[in-house]
Amino acid sequence: GDNYPPKNMYIKLIRNKPKGNAITGRLIVDDGQLTLDTLEPWQYAIPAGCYRLRLTYSPAFQEILPILDGVLGYARQPHNGIRRTGIRIHAGNTIADSRGCILVGSIDMGDKARLLSSRKALNELREYLLNYQKEYPNEEIYIEITEPDAYPLYDVPYECQLQKP
């Protein structure tokens, strides 16, 4: 089809500096078509870097959820030296709801370590990604995670493109 040049989708997760044990951030999907707030637990957070994102069924959550695939981390090793696997994006309100997974929602302005409307945010994200996959079945989705002190932000995550599987 007229599906060229390849329309790989890029998602950016721009992390803020950790406050206590919480890392907040912004998830910018497809050049800002969708933006969501994120929350991660610092001690389990995966390294900054570039990952392929897939949508698979999660037996634990009993729903289709994004999963980060292919650990192409740089700039920072996992805190405990353990390679993180099974990292998903899912709903939740505080870091107690995550063992390294990325929670999405809207930051509670009264309590920055808390997400509101998380289920709604997850549904929006999943719907956007599923529609994209339907429209571009042969393309990949990449997520680049950046940190303020770890790596410069690029408009186009060049590492992602270099390391295509």
Residue spans for each PLM region:
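Cell wall/extracellular polymer interaction/catalysis modules
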Residues: 4-141, 147-152, 158
